[in-house]
Every structure is written in structure tokens, then in C-alpha cells.
Amino acid sequence: MSEAEARPTNFIRQIIDEDLASGKHTTICTRFPPEPNGYLHIGHAKSICLNFGIAQDYHGQCNLRFDDTNPVKEDLEFVESIKNDVQWLGFHWSGDVRYSSDYFDQLYNYAVELINKGLAYVDELSPEQIREYRGTLTAPGKNSPFRDRSVEENLALFEKMRAGGFEEGKACLRAKIDMASPFIVMRDPVLYRIKFAEHHQTGNKWCIYPMYDFTHCISDALEGITHSLCTLEFQDNRRLYDWVLDNITIPVHPRQYEFSRLNLEYTVMSKRKLNLLVTDKHVEGWDDPRMPTISGLRRRGYTAASIREFCKRIGVTKQDNTVEMAALEACIREDLNENAPRAMAVIDPVKLVIENYPQGHSEMVSMPNHPNKPEMGNRDVPFSGEIWIDRADFREEANKQYKRLVLGKEVRLRNAYVIKAERVEKDDAGEITTIYCTYDAETLSKDPADGRKVKGVIHWVSAAHALPVEIRLYDRLFSVPNPGAAEDFLTTINKDSLVIKQGYAEPGLKNAEAGKAWQFEREGYFCLDSRHANGDKLVFNRTVGLRDTWAKIGE
């Protein structure tokens, strides 16, 4: 397969192919421009894969530029987390990290140019009045009484804004376009506003800050971006993007193209809502494994490769749609099924005693680290006469469909012996505390000599060698597919989104690395929690189950 055939195809790549074929561009330059006011989420991953992927495939460049024009909401913590997320996903930006604040001097000069052309003015309406004057989708706006100030007056007032001569909210710079435009974004949008706040890059040099729509297009042009890729909600903003560049003296005029944003079931993507989940302590933090943030997915055990594959599968279109959670889970399940070594852990343990096993004896049984990959080798796991099994793997009575341990019947212990349940011991509440069994000593990893069939296989952990572990069973954070549509999305939080169990694992997991994935046999895929990797007790997070459970949930 050729390189071109192996590439994904979509309408944006078709545009790029045409631009290269026509000679409009000889090299491709894209950018990823996050605002450093929160952690990146799975929706940003789609944009990262698109922009950096295009740069890779077309041997161009992709800039990482922080849209840092609102110092009140931004923080260096978010800057660092975003850089880490981009690199963890497997991408590298071209040259140094860029900031919109790098261009504050040029942006100011371009604003002065618009004033000199009679295309911008200082407005002293209050923010509430500006909203009122802007009109609605069905009613045109009306001109500000300050709209027709002279160029000289506007220059003086804009300089006064810069010098700190106005209080916040008392003045702003607006573009002079058309208050009757059918597009509200073109009704004299604000270009600069006053904020007396220290900026994480420029300190206290500025007290006026440019708005996104003014900053974005000029930053693209200054960096020589050829294709400025945004999500669909910025479609109308393209008119302002072009208006600004058409009316200033700048040699490069990038083009903006819009694609559909990623919507995922059973979660929210709004930074405001995600922030509320964190500040109100509905979750542990931005990296809570139930969060759709890249750091949350990473802590849960998602791999960068699985997220890239997910973004590849959902594709790039102009149609908004909501992706089922099963699609994301399928990507990580396939990845881990292929690559995760196997281990045994008992999540809901009950003691099982093999009464005819030599007392005080133990032995090592060999187990493959991966059933389909002999190159991953084997491991030795201790076995003894007292083991832990999962409570769900035993019943006193059961029908023929139940292929686990039943009183009076046999089952195989994974890679060990065939055992038969003889009797049980219960506490005062009727709860089984111990299962007593016998074993067939001639069945270590082989069938019974007399030819009898033993159909079920269950996993186990030797009690004498067991490693106590905390197991966190994560589920969807919300109980409805579209929590954002609820009047109060917090009322739809799934109270069972985290269930904590105290279990036992085979001793080899004592040296598990944080973030490394394991398949706990018959249970699912788990990883050691990075926040608790050095604690007294090992904490494992369930990344995903062995099978797709979403089809049942949706029925």
C-alpha cells in the first residue's frame, strides 16, 4: 500500500490535495491553538490528531499556539498539562511553543491601523448596553452613540485604554462593520477589552487584551498558517476572520475550514461543566478516570494509540453527530487484548480450602503471559491449599448454563487443578465464608485420566501469597446518554460511576508500573493508578471490561 493510499481521506485533505496540485501552496502549515484555561479532553484529541496528522502526512509543520488572551481564566498549570497531553498522544510541534501574547505588539498596531482607516472605534457603552444594542437573530442592531467619533478621538481614547485610563467595562474597541448584518458576529464586534490582571507570559505590561476573533486570524497569518481548522461553531466567525485580514496590511491570508466537533455519549465536553464537576468535588480532579479529559483517560488506562485510532475511526465531517461510548471502548479493548499481559486478581473474594491438598505445601504453576503470544513468555504463580476465588464463581445450586463451581460438582482452576465443591461454611447472616473442596492431584494443567469432562474454568489467587489490592470499578459518569441536555446536568450523575472493592492479586503484580495495562483474567483490563502507585496499598483502575456492555445498557 502506498503512503497516499494509507492516509485517511476527508474533505479537508481533499482541499489540501487540490491546493497542492494547483500550486496555491507548496508546503502545508496547520496549528493547534488551545486556550490554557482547562485540561484537554477527547474532543481536543480529535483536533490534535487532525492538525498534527495532516502536518505529518504532508511533510509540513504544525504549530502549538496558546490562545492566551484572557489572563483571568488562564494558568501555567494548564499550559504544562496541554504540552504534556500533546506529546503523550505522540505528536511534536514545529519549533518553539507559540503564544498569542507573542503578537500583542503587532495586534495593537493592527488595531491602530483599523482606527486610522475608520474601521474601528472606542465605545463607552456598558457591556449590558452593547448586548442590548446588538439586536437578535430576527431584529437588527442599532448604532452606538459613540460610533461616529473621529479617527483622532478614537486614537487618543485607545491609547488612554492602553495606559489604564479607563476602569474595566467602561470602554472597549469595536470593529465598525454593519449593525444590521444578518450575522450577529458582524455587528460591530468587540476587538479589545480592558482587564487589569497579571498575564502568565507578559506580566503587567498590558491592561487591554484582544478578543479571540481579532487575535486568531492575525496570529494565523503571522505564522503563515495555510489551513486554519476549526469546529463548526466557528462557521459564522469565518466572516469576521476574513474581514479583519482583508482590512489590514498583512501579506498572508489563511483560509478557515470547519469540521464537526466530537460529541460522546454519557459525558460532557463543556469546560464550564467539567470545571463545575471538579470544583464541586463530584470527581477527584481533572484527571479523574471518569472524566473525558486526556489526563483522565490516561489515568484510567487508555493508551495514546487507542485514542488516535478512535479519532481515525470517527473521521472528519461537516455533520454534527454523537458517538457511542462503545466506539471508544472498542478501540482500547482491541489494543489491550493484543498487547496487555495477563494476570489473576479476585475482585470479590471468598475463601476456598482444598481439604485433601498437602497441609502447608505450595507449588509454582506456569502460566502464559498472553495466550496468543508465546513470545511474551510465561510466569510462575504460587498455588496452595487455601485460595481466593470470586464470590460470583460459586453457587450452591445452579442450572446447566452456569459453567462455574457448584456444590457437589467440579470445575478447573485456571492452569492448575480440577476441584470439587464438597460443603460450605456460613456466618450468622447466611453469607458463605468458606468453600471446602477436594482436588484431583493428577489434573495439573491436564484433563482427568478417566476421561470425565470438566467444562468450567475459574481464576484464583493463593491466599498465602495474595497481594491485597484496591480495585476501582469505573463506569460512565452520567446515567443518561446526553447529560448536557438536562436542565441540571448534575442531577444525571451516575451514583455507581465508581465502585471500590478490596480484593487480592497474584504476587507478581507487586512491582507493577503505574499506567501499565493488565488483563485481569475473566474480569477486564486494569492499570495501576498513577496517583497511588507509591502508597501502602496498590490501587488498580478498571479501564474497560472484556466485552461490550453498552448494547445492553441502551436496550
Swiss-Prot record:
Keyword Signal applies: no
Q: What is its EC number?
A: 6.1.1.18
> Which parts of the sequence form the motif 'KMSKS' region?
268-272
Q: Give the motif span ('HIGH' region).
A: 34-44
Q: Which family does it belong to?
A: Belongs to the class-I aminoacyl-tRNA synthetase family.
Q: Which gene encodes it?
A: glnS
- Organism, by scientific name, is Cronobacter sakazakii (strain ATCC BAA-894) (Enterobacter sakazakii)
* A Pfam family it matches: tRNA-synt_1c
Q: How does it assemble?
A: Monomer.
Name the record gives this protein: Glutamine--tRNA ligase
Which GO molecular function annotations are given, in alphabetical order?
A: ATP binding; glutamine-tRNA ligase activity
| Compartments in which it is found | Cytoplasm
Q: What class of enzyme is it?
A: ligase
Q: What is its main location?
A: cytoplasm
Source organism, top-level taxon: Bacteria
One GO cellular-component annotation of the UniProt record comes to: cytosol
Quote the record's binding site residues for L-glutamine. 67, 212
InterPro entries to which the protein is assigned, alphabetical: aa-tRNA-synth_I_CS (IPR001412), Gln-tRNA-synth (IPR004514), Gln/Glu-tRNA_Ligase (IPR050132), Gln_tRNA_ligase_bac (IPR022861), Glu/Gln-tRNA-synth (IPR000924), Glu/Gln-tRNA-synth_Ib_cat-dom (IPR020058), Glu/Gln-tRNA-synth_Ib_codon-bd (IPR020059), Glu_tRNA_lig_a-bdl (IPR020061)
Q: Which UniProt keywords apply?
A: Aminoacyl-tRNA synthetase, ATP-binding, Cytoplasm, Ligase, Nucleotide-binding, Protein biosynthesis
